[in-house]
């Protein structure tokens, strides 16, 4: 019967799965979503978080040079603060270890991967999501005046 069958399915998943914000550029959003979805596989999550950061900087027009150079360029252009650039370099280094199979320390911990994912999400919020929300708020206020 249907009622007993429904009892075999969870009503809710805990913790709730996270979704990358729709206001992120598509490539960055895809990488960030993969990072969120693979946090149980820390090396994969760290690599995807690093790729999300890379895609975000490219979306901001920083396409030349290595990711290291692009992070420094973002700092020089005031796209990132010093603290954000420092954290971005940590994410870059963390994603490089599994990506390049570092011989001495190839893996990241779950905590390190989570920090990388958190940074990529925070960077996306700072560079894209907050800006989109502000633009929508301004537009809504202007429409109310009309």
Go through each PLM region and give its residues.
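Hydrophobic alpha-helical packing segments in soluble, helical-rich domains
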Residues: 43-63
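Short, charged amphipathic alpha-helical segments flanked by flexible coils
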Residues: 5-11, 61-94
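General structural signal for alpha-helix termini and helix-helix connectors
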Residues: 34-37, 41, 58, 73-77, ...
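Amphipathic, non-membrane alpha-helical segments in soluble helical-bundle scaffolds
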Residues: 17-21, 25, 42-46, 81-88, ...
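Charge-enriched, short contiguous segments at helix-coil
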Residues: 86-93, 97-146
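Generic structural signal for well-ordered, non-membrane alpha-helices
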Residues: 26, 30-33, 51-54, 69, ...
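Hydrophobic/aromatic-lined pockets within catalytic cores
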Residues: 40, 57-62, 125-128, 132
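Charged alpha-helical initiation segments
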Residues: 1-43, 145-146
């Amino acid at each position: 019967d249907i009622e007993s069958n429904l009892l075999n399915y969870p009503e809710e998943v805990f913790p709730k799965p996270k979704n990358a914000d729709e206001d992120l550029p598509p490539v960055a959003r895809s990488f960030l979503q993969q990072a969120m979805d693979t946090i149980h596989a820390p090396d994969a999550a760290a690599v995807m978080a690093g790729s999300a950061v890379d895609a975000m900087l490219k979306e901001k027009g920083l396409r030349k040079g290595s990711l290291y150079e692009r992070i420094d360029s973002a700092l020089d252009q005031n796209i990132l603060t010093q603290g954000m650039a420092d954290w971005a370099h940590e994410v870059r280094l963390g994603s490089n270890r599994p990506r390049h199979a570092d011989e001495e320390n190839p893996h990241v911990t779950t905590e390190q991967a989570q920090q990388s994912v958190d940074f990529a999400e925070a960077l996306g919020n700072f560079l894209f999501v907050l800006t989109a929300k502000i633009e929508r708020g301004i537009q809504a206020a202007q429409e109310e005046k009309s």
